């Protein structure tokens, strides 16, 4: 009798299961807009500070995290750099109202961002970017 041992492969989530997304911004109105835009497509959790986001991130798995750059009590870029170290498959998106070349360079080199979005962000662009990020997360997990 020939018995083959096989390792269980990590499967992609079922098609009906929404991908988990964490959105961090200190502006309640933007959190509300982002959540309303993304909720039909994703399981959205919001945080209004870096400290709150760090707590949430360690309690739940997320495929994608979206962070505002400048927030009181911490900045989104530093948060995303730490998140990359702890959760390398999780895709990171930085949203900001301004762009400085050195910040763009740091975001690419240190945080390995999936995308860098300038405010104002259109709802269609936001949804598309998060969908693409969630797909890349799944491919990254499957690839090991």
Where on the chain are the PLM-derived regions?
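Alpha4 helix (beta4-alpha4-beta5 surface) of REC/receiver domains from two-component response regulators
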Residues: 78, 99-116
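Acidic catalytic/metal-coordinating carboxylates
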Residues: 48-49, 75-78
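C-terminal output helix
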Residues: 121-130, 134, 138
């Amino acid at each position: 009798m020939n018995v083959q041992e096989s390792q269980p492969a990590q499967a992609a989530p079922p098609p009906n299961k929404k991908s988990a997304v964490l959105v961090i911004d200190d502006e309640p109105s933007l959190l509300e807009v982002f959540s309303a835009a993304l909720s039909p497509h994703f399981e959205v959790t919001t945080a209004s500070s870096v400290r709150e986001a760090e707590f949430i991130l360690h309690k739940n798995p997320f495929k994608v995290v979206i962070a505002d750059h400048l927030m009181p009590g911490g900045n989104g870029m530093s948060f995303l750099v730490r998140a990359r170290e702890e959760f390398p498959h999780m895709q990171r998106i930085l949203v900001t109202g301004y762009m400085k070349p050195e910040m763009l360079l740091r975001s690419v080199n240190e945080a390995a961002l999936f995308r860098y979005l300038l405010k104002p962000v259109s709802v269609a662009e936001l949804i598309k970017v998060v969908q693409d990020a969630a797909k890349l997360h799944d491919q990254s997990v499957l690839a090991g």
